[in-house]
Amino acid sequence: MRLIVLKVQGVSPLYATWRIDEWCRPYFSYYGANWTSLYWCFNQCIPVWLITSLILLNNDLKSVGFWYSFTLLYSPWAAMGLFPVIFIYVAYRLFKDIKLMLSVLTLQNIVFPLFVLLVVGSFYMSNRHPLADCGWWWKFEQPMVFLPKYIAFILLELGIYFYAMRNELCKSSWLIISFVVLLFIPFYKMTVWNDFMMRASLPALFIVFMYWTRWCMRNLHSRRMLIVVVYVVTSLTALQLMVNSLVDTVRAGKPVLTNANERFCNTSDLEVVKLGDGQFFAHDYKTTFFWKYLSR
């Protein structure tokens, strides 16, 4: 599929193995591979993965809201993606046994999340500039143009895993919920590069790939070896990203100078400056609730 897409774009097939998880660009956004997320936003994905793991391991509901609230401190978009996963799971558990309601209504599930929401929410609301390219996909494309892309994307990104693990679905509500959430995330877009889709998908993708890894470990025999081989081939992304970092370091011969070493958005690209100024800087911040009551 990536070869076909690149051929249409006029790109050499030799490039086909580079960043396989981005096969659908520029026709659609993408779900980042685990190593891609580590490469570009390790400060977000590692905490989110750890928090998701804690929630999965903690089978009772007494602290699910407590652990969830930590995602707001690291990645608000990932928090948006994890919220429906937890909400549906808790609702499902309560539907099966309403007596669990007392387990949900605990101090740590109510007080701490509200406190974090107050601090983090007021901080982000200090920037009153609207996000560029924010809204439902049909705001940017006609439905009949979007839907074929969406169907192809879902079939190729999730279809293989769904089919392979179809027998696992009836055993795990976490897996079913994660697939459902991943079906809906592509319908909304935030920022030019659609950071929402790449970050909000982190928790659900992590859950899916944990189950996928377990499935592979249980099925390493010849009849299903082809699927495992395909999974190994896609790991080229991790190797390429590591090589990319090593090569850049060797070429530089010293720490690579980036905008972070000087000033954020210190570039001659006016579009980047305009985007960064609106998305990452809070103007008139001294009039905001966060500055007046929380920051000092």
Please place each PLM-identified region on the residue numbering.
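Transmembrane catalytic cores of multi-pass membrane glycosyltransferases
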Residues: 2-16, 42, 73-168, 172, ...
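Membrane-interface alpha helices of multi-pass inner-membrane proteins
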Residues: 35-36, 53-54, 62-87
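Short hydrophobic alpha-helices at membrane interfaces in multi-pass membrane enzymes
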Residues: 56-71, 99, 109-110, 176
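Hydrophobic/aromatic-rich transmembrane helices and adjacent perimembrane loops
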Residues: 195-218
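Intrinsically disordered, polar/acidic, low-complexity terminal segments
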Residues: 224-296
